[in-house]
UniProtKB/Swiss-Prot annotation:
Pfam families: MscL. One of its GO terms (cellular component) is plasma membrane. The keyword Cell inner membrane applies. This is Large-conductance mechanosensitive channel. It comes from Caulobacter sp. (strain K31).
């Protein structure tokens, strides 16, 4: 399964544990990720785009009056939104990798094989066990009962002529 597909499934499912981990990680790394985006990621992107500073991109709906300062600037600051989306994606990838690691550990724990039942003894082992048991019994000598002797028939001889 590809990382992109797993990431898409991760974002789409509504697991409470995943959400809690995401909130905690997102809150903990907010300052780090903001610094990473603003100071490391966005300057090279700005350089590639001709010195464009995304944080200052905006659509001015109503310009400010610099003389009287009575009218404030009204603008949609989509550059700040772009920075926030990049920050979110970084946090989401980190949380995804963390959850992937936890799931891998859970699967490894669940996949531990149950202890095997002892194998049935082979015929040789059964025979050796019987011999061992017989040798372990105390030796008792008992006389075999004498059988009544049956009369032995004499062979008939033919008279000599």
């Amino acid at each position: 399964m590809s990382i992109v597909k797993e990431f898409r499934e991760f974002i789409a499912r509504g697991n409470v544990v995943d959400l809690a981990v995401g909130v905690i990680i997102g809150a903990a790394f907010n300052g780090i990720v903001k610094s990473l985006v603003d100071g490391v990621i966005m300057p090279p992107i700005g350089l590639v785009t001709g010195g464009l500073d995304f944080s200052k991109l905006q659509w001015v709906l109503k310009p400010e009056d610099p003389v009287t300062e009575a009218v404030e600037l009204v603008a949609i600051q989509y550059g700040a939104f772009i920075n926030t989306v990049i920050q979110f994606l970084i946090v989401a990838v980190v949380v995804f990798l963390l959850v992937k690691l936890v799931n891998h550990i859970r699967r490894a724990d669940a996949a531990e094989p149950a202890p095997e039942a002892p194998a049935a003894p082979t015929p040789e082992e059964r025979l050796l066990t019987e011999i061992r048991d017989l040798l372990a019994k105390p030796a008792t000598v008992t006389a075999a009962p004498k059988a009544a002797a049956a009369p032995v028939a004499k062979p008939k001889t033919k008279p000599k002529a």
